[in-house]
Curated annotation (Swiss-Prot):
This is ATP-dependent Clp protease proteolytic subunit. Its main location: plastid. It comes from Nephroselmis olivacea (Green alga). The keyword Plastid applies. It is found in: Plastid, Chloroplast stroma. Component of the chloroplastic Clp protease core complex. Its EC number is 3.4.21.92. Cleaves peptides in various proteins in a process that requires ATP hydrolysis. Has a chymotrypsin-like activity. Plays a major role in the degradation of misfolded proteins. InterPro entries: ClpP, ClpP/crotonase-like_dom_sf, ClpP/TepA, ClpP_His_AS, ClpP_Ser_AS. GO terms for cellular component: chloroplast stroma; endopeptidase Clp complex. One of its GO terms (biological process) is protein quality control for misfolded or incompletely synthesized proteins. The active site is at residues 101, 126.
Amino acid sequence: MPVGVPKVPYRLPGESAPQWVDLYNRLYRQRLLFMGQELGDELSNQLCGIMIYLFAEDPSIPLFMYINSPGGSVTSGLGVFDIATVMMQDVTTICVGIAASMASLVLSGGSTGQRLALPHARMMIHQPEGGSRGQASDVMYESSEVERLRDIVVDCYVERTHQSRETIIIDLNRDLFMSPRQARSYGLIDAVALPAVKEEYTGFSMFS
């Protein structure tokens, strides 16, 4: 039986008594964002809206986005990627579990030096897919649009990984899975996050 989203206490500024809010709402207030499901319009709009709101509230405080997603809609992924890369605010992206397809592109869109993966995470890149059905004119239009989106995705990976365009095109032709070390060498992330020594634990440490 599903338990739903847990609720946790949170005291609003100026309030004497805490209120019970859902876990993700509480974490958003701490500038911790989660992409924990397939990326569609609803999740994309939520993430983009939260990032824009938090940027407007205080652009000097960084955001942290935890990613455990199989990917999803190309346009939804590009929306989150664009917001993360164009805002004048540090966005740390962290792969927890898997960042596949468009989720791997969002992962790569974190601020330079702040794109991380946990030790046993997996990343996967491949080219956008389209389901061409219907009349011939519709199929041709969709094929053209898929090619356009594919070129955009290739350009984004080239910019974020510094791999050659030829390398990216070849690698996107199949499901290319990577370990954190491989993703770091590829340029998809900057470092692998490791827990610090227990006695001195303050969060995650990194090695490059």
